[in-house]
């Protein structure tokens, strides 16, 4: 998750995702943080009476990376390097 209070001026989640993608590493926004909003929960009684603020916050700050068993160590290393490089810029004071 991208913590808003730790971002440098001019950086937001979309800019972070774009910068990681520009380095050739697939990166996306989103999560299933507010899954209770899905149609499958209509009429079940399982949906909370009010939106859950932490779930909403996580949904608006999350980033996603490809994770699957066919990734090579080199691909994982490239991903980690790109994340570190971008986050160093995105959190600089």
What are these regions (language model features)?
Residues 1, 62-66:
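Short aromatic/hydrophobic contact patches that present stacked aromatics
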Residues 1-3, 35:
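Conserved glycine-rich beta-strand-loop-beta hairpin in the small C-terminal domain of fold type I
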Residues 7-15, 71-77:
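Short, conserved charged micro-motifs
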Residues 15-51, 57-63, 91-93:
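Conserved PLP cofactor-binding pocket of PLP-dependent enzymes
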Residues 57-58, 69-76, 91:
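Feature detects long, helix-prone N-terminal segments enriched in hydrophobes
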Residues 83:
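Hydrophobic "lid"/C-terminal helical patch
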